[in-house]
């Protein structure tokens, strides 16, 4: 079976996380299925210099957010799972409560029901009780809550270094190794 990963980009700040995932997966020759929310399109335009077509060209397949009949909306379409990078609190809440009202949340619902890996790079601070409850619930459902917290021990030099390490770590949860996912070797004596 070809390795396939669904990449969801939702409307939280941090559109770059989704782009970096697509870049790293292209280098690994893993088939990517991209779905981008309307809020994510707004974040792309306000936070980055990326053109929409430039981002979409990184994916093997791009599915419109409203296409509930897309292949990734069915459990019979085999994937390694789904990475939502970044994941807004609205998307998290929709996944937890089973609202498959758009293709991003429907695909996440399918990944959970098929017992595949769902990794949510949640982006919000500070967190309120509803956020924390939803994170707990999605974890109980089998999802992985993965806030993209900078790994300062790696001594990042740029924002891209921080993004690359977080995304590489998230991809390692799918068994995908990238050059940015080097193992921690411990502290020097």
Curated annotation (Swiss-Prot):
FMN binds at residues 11-13, 37, 88-91, 123. InterPro entries: Flavin_trans-like, Flavoprotein, UbiX-like. Its EC number is 2.5.1.129. Dimethylallyl phosphate binds at residue 153. SUPFAM superfamilies: Homo-oligomeric flavin-containing Cys decarboxylases, HFCD. It comes from the Bacteria. Coiled coil: none annotated. Keywords: Flavoprotein, FMN, Prenyltransferase, Transferase. GO terms for molecular function: carboxy-lyase activity; flavin prenyltransferase activity. It catalyses: dimethylallyl phosphate + FMNH2 = prenylated FMNH2 + phosphate. Pfam families: Flavoprotein. Flavin prenyltransferase that catalyzes the synthesis of the prenylated FMN cofactor (prenyl-FMN) for 4-hydroxy-3-polyprenylbenzoic acid decarboxylase UbiD. The prenyltransferase is metal-independent and links a dimethylallyl moiety from dimethylallyl monophosphate (DMAP) to the flavin N5 and C6 atoms of FMN. Belongs to the UbiX/PAD1 family. This is Flavin prenyltransferase UbiX. It comes from Neisseria meningitidis serogroup A / serotype 4A (strain DSM 15465 / Z2491).
